[in-house]
Amino acid sequence: MRTQWPSPAKLNLFLYITGQRADGYHTLQTLFQFLDYGDTISIELRDDGDIRLLTPVEGVEHEDNLIVRAARLLIKTAADSGRLPTGSGANISIDKRLPMGGGLGGGSSNAATVLVALNYLWQCGLSMDELAEMGLTLGADVPVFVRGHAAFAEGVGEILTPVDPPEKWYLVAHPGVSIPTPVIFKDPELPRNTPKRSIETLLKCEFSNDCEVIARKRFREVDAVLSWLLEYAPSRLTGTGACVFAEFDTESEARQVLEQAPEWLNGFVAKGVNLSPLHRAML
């Protein structure tokens, strides 16, 4: 039997770089919220212990794909603790809607969905804490998708505090370029000394993203999309880009602006949600 699982997008409603550690990683403060929009992962169980990704990603080796790595990590962790039923395997396919290098967390969300879904389907019995800890070894954004609640993140993104920001409507636009995260984080002009503030203070301030000035400077496509969106609503970069989003109170307002978008702007409208669609599907 094949089951389908949501793999939602996320937005960084704000993102501030507060420092850089000796190991090169940047410390930050950011606010994650999910969207009711994303990829869909289909899983069909196997009884021969094999993991097969039926929809390979161009340019990514099978064993390097985060979906496969997540499944293999769960197999190893559950087996090491005697919680993996014999023969646990899966055929996995993905209906991909989220762009790579877009700042929407697509790969991290895919990995988290696989961890949560296979843990459930195989009846391994690992806790969300255990799955989140495993997810962190795959990527800094994976734990928030595993835990499934909007969160204020600190450290390098691994210290999560659940929060409930307003669930607004967003027009999310892709400028047509992919921005590898290191391109932004290695830029010498990236702000790295934004003062740390409490979540209470940050929620009262106007939201912004420290990476935006670098993305706009280095990628004229990002600058063009933001310049257009800012004529209609508060807009900013998500993550390290390339996607940007404009914020609206109603779906109709967001759709009206999207209908006026120039032909070169590729976008969609989605609602911000504080409970992940993945976790809603499991209720």
Curated annotation (Swiss-Prot):
It comes from the Bacteria. The keyword Transmembrane helix does not apply. It catalyses: 4-CDP-2-C-methyl-D-erythritol + ATP = 4-CDP-2-C-methyl-D-erythritol 2-phosphate + ADP + H(+). SUPFAM superfamilies: GHMP Kinase, C-terminal domain, Ribosomal protein S5 domain 2-like. The keyword ATP-binding applies. One of its GO terms (molecular function) is 4-(cytidine 5'-diphospho)-2-C-methyl-D-erythritol kinase activity. One of its GO terms (biological process) is terpenoid biosynthetic process. ATP binds at residues 99-109. Pfam families: GHMP_kinases_C (PF08544), GHMP_kinases_N (PF00288). Disulfide bonds: none annotated. The active site is at 10, 141. Keywords: ATP-binding, Isoprene biosynthesis, Kinase, Nucleotide-binding, Transferase. Pathway: Isoprenoid biosynthesis; isopentenyl diphosphate biosynthesis via DXP pathway; isopentenyl diphosphate from 1-deoxy-D-xylulose 5-phosphate: step 3/6. Its EC number is 2.7.1.148. Belongs to the GHMP kinase family. IspE subfamily. Homodimer. Catalyzes the phosphorylation of the position 2 hydroxy group of 4-diphosphocytidyl-2C-methyl-D-erythritol. This is 4-diphosphocytidyl-2-C-methyl-D-erythritol kinase.
